[in-house]
Amino acid sequence: FEGGQTIVADAPYELMPMYIPSGAILAYGPQIEYVDQVPANEITLEVYAGSDGNFNLYEDDGESFDYEKGKFAIIPIRYNDMEKSVTIADRSGEYDGMINDRVFNIRLHNKGVDTKIKSVNYSGKEIVVKF
């Protein structure tokens, strides 16, 4: 689909249509009801092929205003469409209670091709994942 148009689509309760641009990176953690219910030591990245994309995963303690004092972390994530690779770059920053090691489950969605999934362990240093 091209932008700048209205699309009327069936949307039954069990199947919600989503229009996601190529190059988009969507991140989510475990299902929780409150911030510190379970640590988000496993993050899923939904990466949509078709063009390059980038995303900064921002994290803080989720409870205090310490982010105003610079206590937060950012993990830059990039997708290179030509190489079909996802780079999870070096983490910058820190905060109390930060998760140092985690698993990223990366799902690459490519039009007309089965979704590919890879999992990697991340400890704050750059990792390149090739599909």
What are these regions (language model features)?
Residues 1-85, 93-111, 123-124:
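Catalytic core of carbohydrate-active enzymes
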Residues 113-131:
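Intrinsically disordered, low-complexity linkers and stems that provide flexible hinges
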